[in-house]
């Protein structure tokens, strides 16, 4: 840390995530549907984490991996696939928890990109 600049923030605010289809008028309604469902998916992921339910977490990640990629959210799809694949290969619980939290953060960033949405869960 440069002592002349003062303390640096611990985490930079990360930019919202937008669908690669966000400028496609034919896909707008479908993308909006997916985004509207993300809050429920986040809540389900958190519930599975709280219950230490690896089976549910893997199922949710698997479903989200396919859906996110199909709606133009490749970053979310890749993160969800990584969680799904990791759990299927018996990754450590701490690693699964970290990947799930990262996935939840990505989903929250996508929700924050929606006009009129002030925050995400």
Q: Language model features by range: what are they?
A:
Residues 1-59, 63-121:
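Two-component system phosphorelay core
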